[in-house]
Amino acid sequence: MGKNARQTSRLTAKSTLKPARNPREESLATTADVLGKKLVTFSEPTKTPEAGNARVISVVNQKGGVGKTTTAINLGAALAEVGRRVLLIDFDSQASMTTGLGIKGAALREQYGSIWYLLNDSEAKLEDFILKSTVPGLDFIRGHEDLAAAEAAFVSEIAKEHKLRKLLAPVLDKYDVILIDCSPSHGTLTVNALTASNGVIIPMECEYFAVLGLSLVKKTIQKIKENTNPELQILGILATMFERKTSHSREVLELIDKEFPDEVFDTIISRTVRFSESTVAGVPVTAYASSSSGSASYRRLARELIARGGAK
């Protein structure tokens, strides 16, 4: 059995962790019930007849700990549930997405088959190293800690900002959506991800200091549009880690919605222990705690993204 096959078999092993019963958690939140905006409903999307011409979406914020990885994994899983063929790319040296999908220990540290390996081996083909998650229709490429060296490794390369775009090109006709979990920086990796993408989702914690960094993210996106990818679009700002019981969360959400009224997703992601529990279990929250508010929120976000045209 080859290395790739061994990693896949480890991944698909069922977790023994189970969610606790009768969880006390936030209910599903939207801008309608939190801010009093008009309620928007999104119909269940029809399945696409065949994959192809994938929409590439970067999940970006230059601040860490705002829910990028949680969003990439669980939005991807929710899209797969409605028949979309989804590929996740772990583009962060912390490899949190890889861990959240069940790869741990020695397999996590192995460079061979990771996105870092693919970026550095011109003869390697991305399609040869795609791993299957426990969710049908949800595939992924592992991250690796050596991604932290990208800035120095690619400094002298010509057209270095196009490396990921070229790597993804052969698999665009095999998927409907490709989600890239970006590193919390505005360096070479993020530039590569944005250059390869059609759209951007910006998760933003409902905390005041997170608002201050939002303008920096938007400036980075504007620079990419001016220099390497004029078609790049902001698909939406996603409020995360919302706590209904605190006035601060509501005040921050009001501020974001006032500043960017056309860009804020109607769906809000509330804070819940289910997200951290599902990461430990190595599966998306939609599989770990299917009836939880976290699962419901990401399923609603998937419908909203499709309705907005961000995904087909």
Name each model-derived stretch.
Residues M1-K312:
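P-loop NTP-binding core
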